[in-house]
């Protein structure tokens, strides 16, 4: 059972480094704030100057389309001065450390820094070296808190609740920060979580996560309300985990016959980027009745607007 949710007046944390740092009041506060931005983002005038005079710096050390553009749009719609650094042309390429970069940026007095980094814990290190708030946009395979928050908002928007739902997360769990953040948040909000993956893509410590584990996808999808697919994180794999993409699709790709084991109204989710024909069938990805993948992107802007506003205050 989920703990009773009470509305929070103020966030309990200075930084957003991970879901595990948040209380259920913090989560509810962020989601309620995000809901207030949904209609604004659908209107003709999308600008709300609540962060006028504030400076937001985006540091993305890994490639990103959805998260980086979402944070940039979010900041601009709130009226902040947004600087997205091109890390390929930064002093990092000349050997500068993250700590020295942090000290340099801190001297410019930003109000908030958004960071994505390939190393787990990099955002925590940055938060210790700057005076402003730090938002984690994904650090290694550790956490991706705003993705979990936007996924939760998407589920609530469609299902009106999370508590009592059965959610399947299928794919490369070992290397997925999205999986970890979603597991933490879904457990907090009272969902039952099924993890589906080949045994060699299942974390060794998975038993500690409070989830059900399956290597058989059809069994794992049985009576699920939500099916969340994840891509293979080939860039984080140090050795070959699979014989071929074709074999992976046969056993772990979401197809109509596998989806039939979930509930008839089960929703399909994916954080992106998608690899069609590997972890998901194209027709299912584009199914207007069941796929909420585009809605995840849309609500992601609202969630990130909420996070920027809350943590800048």
Curated annotation (Swiss-Prot):
Catalytic activities: carbamoyl phosphate + L-aspartate = N-carbamoyl-L-aspartate + phosphate + H(+)
GO molecular function, one term: aspartate carbamoyltransferase activity
GO biological process: 'de novo' pyrimidine nucleobase biosynthetic process; 'de novo' UMP biosynthetic process; amino acid metabolic process
Main enzyme class: transferase
SUPFAM superfamilies per record: Aspartate/ornithine carbamoyltransferase (SSF53671)
A GO CC term attached to the entry: cytosol
Subunit structure: Heterododecamer (2C3:3R2) of six catalytic PyrB chains organized as two trimers (C3), and six regulatory PyrI chains organized as three dimers (R2).
Function comment: Catalyzes the condensation of carbamoyl phosphate and aspartate to form carbamoyl aspartate and inorganic phosphate, the committed step in the de novo pyrimidine nucleotide biosynthesis pathway.
Stated name of the protein: Aspartate carbamoyltransferase catalytic subunit
